[in-house]
Amino acid sequence: MLFKKKKVLPEKLPQHIGIIMDGNGRWAKKRGLPRSAGHSAGAKTFQSIARYCNKIGIKYLTVYAFSTENWKRPKDEVDAIMKLLRDYLVDSVNFTDENIKVKFLGNLSMLTDELNRLIKKAEDDSKNATGLCLNIALNYGGRDEIVRSVQKMAENGVDLSKLTEQELSDHLYTAGIPDPDLIIRPSGEYRLSNFLIWQSAYAEYWFTDRLWPDFSEKDIDSAVNAFALRDRRYGGTK
């Protein structure tokens, strides 16, 4: 367990963790399996990690499930991902029973009516949960989020010449959610890939070569303990 092994004090825990769930395809390829098998394995890891973050006291977890750029992938792979999402929403673990609040971030208008109905139900069913706030970034892109937010403000008559950082933040998908303290990226890649690019201005980063389906509670422990040792100055000095 995290607290017994490393004795990370609750006040040293990151309040908000963001995870770029990467490496499903490579995991499957290494095993001679279709990419869909990697996504299925990654979905199980997602559920396990969400439960663990809730258990150790993380307040917010945002996972990058499907980007605006992922539509460029082969249709059969996209269809497999959407089926996994549907199966998760209909048949899989009910996070509401574990006091986890579920919220979806992204341009959901491009999804099917059925998926949107299931997403709304998942959000409504968990809205009173007081444990982990689990944000699932779906058809999400950081640049797209900013553009849509500015467009929405312009449509609502906001004087953009007087726009402040706080006003923009208040119109993002993440409005009301604190900025991430820690961004985790598995799979050996060292980039943000358009994930929470506005919100992560002062986030700490933690990278690992481990592919997402192999990611475990021990990796969360390692990331959280590394975070606890860092000196966050937010551009100032101490």
Residue ranges and their predicted role:
Residues M1-K238:
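Flexible, compositionally biased loop and terminal segments
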